[in-house]
Amino acid sequence: MDFNVTIVGQAISFVLFVFFCMKYVWPSVIFIIETRQKEIKDSLTFIENSKKELNIFKENSKNEIKIIKKNASKIIDSAIQQKTQILKQAYLAAEKEKQTILKQAKLDVMIEYQKARYELRQKVSKIAVEIAKKIINRSICIEEQNSIISSLIKKI
């Protein structure tokens, strides 16, 4: 292989090209690469931080949900107890009202019973007086008296 001027010229051109690239092109390429690497690193850091924040938020949400569920169950239990208490009070009030109504009804029945008894005595005494008057007014035979008495007794 001959070592001629063309090869030397190409070698010098290549060295100048490499020098030119190293001096002017390479720093901007390195700057762009470093900038991209920094952006990627920042993005990855941001993603990691976001994941951590998300996990913390999830844990906080779970804890808050547990607390809310406990409070809701306490409220429901309290409402059930209030319902039970209100029902008991209503039952007791209804029972008391029932007893009052029953006492009043018994009293009314007793009064009606006394009235009916009194009226019946009045009627019986009137009938007895009528019978006595009829017996006295009529001097009739015993057979007729017995028939009159039995007919009046049937009326009673």
Curated annotation (Swiss-Prot):
It comes from Buchnera aphidicola subsp. Baizongia pistaciae (strain Bp). It is found in: Cell membrane. HAMAP family: ATP_synth_b_bprime. SUPFAM superfamilies: F1F0 ATP synthase subunit B, membrane domain. PANTHER family: ATP SYNTHASE SUBUNIT B, ATP SYNTHASE SUBUNIT B', CHLOROPLASTIC. It is a single-pass membrane protein. The keyword Membrane applies. Belongs to the ATPase B chain family. F-type ATPases have 2 components, F(1) - the catalytic core - and F(0) - the membrane proton channel. F(1) has five subunits: alpha(3), beta(3), gamma(1), delta(1), epsilon(1). F(0) has three main subunits: a(1), b(2) and c(10-14). The alpha and beta chains form an alternating ring which encloses part of the gamma chain. F(1) is attached to F(0) by a central stalk formed by the gamma and epsilon chains, while a peripheral stalk is formed by the delta and b chains. The keyword Transmembrane applies. Its main location: membrane. F(1)F(0) ATP synthase produces ATP from ADP in the presence of a proton or sodium gradient. F-type ATPases consist of two structural domains, F(1) containing the extramembraneous catalytic core and F(0) containing the membrane proton channel, linked together by a central stalk and a peripheral stalk. During catalysis, ATP synthesis in the catalytic domain of F(1) is coupled via a rotary mechanism of the central stalk subunits to proton translocation. This is ATP synthase subunit b. One of its GO terms (molecular function) is proton-transporting ATPase activity, rotational mechanism. Pfam families: ATP-synt_B (PF00430). Keywords: ATP synthesis, Cell membrane, CF(0), Hydrogen ion transport, Ion transport, Membrane, Transmembrane, Transmembrane helix, Transport. The chain crosses the membrane at residues 12-32. GO terms for cellular component: plasma membrane; proton-transporting ATP synthase complex. The gene is atpF.
